[in-house]
Design a protein with these regions (language model features):
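Class I SAM-dependent methyltransferase SAM/SAH-binding core
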Residues: 51-53, 57-107
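A short acidic, Gly/Pro-enriched loop at the edge of an enzyme's catalytic core
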Residues: 106-117
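A short glycine-rich, Lys/Arg-flanked "PGG" loop and its adjoining helix->strand segment in the class I
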Residues: 131-145
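Short alpha-helix
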Residues: 172-187
Length: 286
């Protein structure tokens, strides 16, 4: 594929959403990874309020709902995603406490201090990692959790081809230590961070895209823009297979401080489970 249109933002957003409408996931992840991230979160009850921001069609949301108490609101700007989200919630008999709404990440339909947990898998980049951290914090209760997966560099140096691709697609991509520092600056306490395994890309993201491309090609025969989008998806997969040692996704779990907490003796603002500056893909989930 030519590098002339090698960023996803070069395509019409409605066409992108239409492509992903027939996929359970719109980015790397897996049920196992969702549950691993959930394992770091305490104190959820039947009264807890959870928001999944940029929920897409809701694959990860349904996993959350089957394993966590509370009421969950999935939010996405694309109505087609929300239609499928709510249909799946009904099919899985979860609609009494799981609902999808059409909305924007930069105008959340929640009150300040209302949420016990904000979840976002592979979607915070739409608003920007730092902006999302700072703007979403006010919606969390004191002691509430934030759990997001985000694209990161695993190394300080990388080949020009993959560096240029990602800097064009998402200028905020950065190393794990720098992301953790951003979490601190936004006023959270880091709880955990782990790298998503390669199967989250190969088996749970790229493999289902083959079927999605078949359906998409049948819907848009001879459409050059649709063909370009499918070529982009194949190029993205090619890049990952060539350069997966240099980048990937990390799940970050953090907590909004509660003023009522009593600090433990010797505690510092940097306490908590955070990856070291030498974190590598091998530190990820298994």
């Amino acid at each position: 594929m030519s590098n002339e249109n090698n960023a996803i933002h070069g395509f019409d957003v409605n066409l992108i959403c239409d492509f992903f409408l027939n996929t359970e996931r719109q980015g790397p992840g897996s049920p196992e990874v969702t549950l691993k991230a959930l394992s770091f979160i305490d104190n959820l009850t039947d009264e807890s309020l959870i928001a999944d921001l940029g929920c897409g069609t809701g694959g990860q949301t349904m996993t959350l709902a089957r394993h966590a108490p509370g009421r969950i609101t999935g939010l996405d700007f694309f109505p087609g995603f929300i239609d499928r989200f709510n249909a799946d919630a009904r099919r899985l008999h979860l609609a009494d406490r799981v609902k999808g709404v059409v909305g924007s990440m930069d105008a959340l339909p929640f009150r300040a201090g209302e949420l016990d947990l904000i979840w976002s898998e592979g979607a915070i980049y739409n608003i920007g990692f730092e902006r999302g951290l700072n703007e979403w914090r006010e919606y969390l209760k004191p002691g509430g959790y934030l759990a997001v997966s985000e694209s990161v560099w695993f190394t300080d140096e990388r080949p020009t081809e993959i560096h240029d691709f990602w800097v064009d697609a998402y200028p905020e991509i950065d190393t794990i230590p720098n992301k953790v520092a951003q979490i601190h600056r936004a006023g959270y306490l880091p709880v955990a961070a782990f790298v998503l395994p390669e199967t989250c890309w190969t088996e749970h993201y790229f493999a289902p895209l083959a079927k999605a491309r078949e359906l998409f090609a049948a819907k848009y025969p001879g459409d050059s823009t649709a063909e370009g989008l499918m070529a982009f998806q194949r190029y993205e997969e090619e890049l990952y297979r060539k350069y997966s040692e240099f980048y990937g996704y990390v799940f970050f779990i953090a907590r909004k401080p509660n003023p009522r907490w009593t600090p433990c003796p010797g505690a510092t603002p940097n306490s908590g489970a955070t990856p070291s500056s030498g974190a590598t893909p091998s530190s990820g989930a298994t």
